[in-house]
Amino acid sequence: MIYTVPDFQNPAGVTLSFARRKQLIALANCHGLIVLEDTPCRHIRFSGQNLPTLQSLDTEGRVIHLGSFSKVLVPGLRIGWVVAAPALLSRLGLLRVAADTQTSTLQMAAASLFLDHHDLTAHIAPLQTAYARKQEAILDAIRQHFPQKITVTDPEGRPFIWATFPDGFDATAFMRDVALQQARVRKPNLLAKATGSARLPFANQRPRSLPAPTFDP
């Protein structure tokens, strides 16, 4: 099995190119592999063009496509969807029953009610705009307070960015200092597992509330 997040991979935010997507499908076909395509942030795109899903490029029914409502409806709505060949779906159904029987009926009913009465695409559009403004605010703060000291991936979507600090800089210690100074980072040890880099979420931040912690390389 191949597990991949082709759109805004976590944590670095890399998006798989169209050519690489076709190569991955060809590789799966050649070796008889199942591809698990996880796309929790695919619909939170600020710029650029959406690329075809791996599932749409699948020619042999090998791709299981996963989507999530938690990023586009309600954060606490921990449900999503699966797109796969019928033979795979029947097996997944059996595994689901063995794992936890079923998803919350109330959550499924709430999502179904929303989808029956609202246009999901129209609902997502203002979210993309709001996230784009928050993203630009945090990038402006980085450019203002950490000029030429922090590099970030070129984020075209998703509600967080991946920052890389200078060589020898302990990102974990820095995040802990920020937590003490600003009371903003709740789990710094989870945000900066690899020394020198950190994932900076901004979904809950208002642009004017973004902190400006002291940075001393």
PLM segments and residue spans:
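PLP-dependent class I/II
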Residues: 1-217
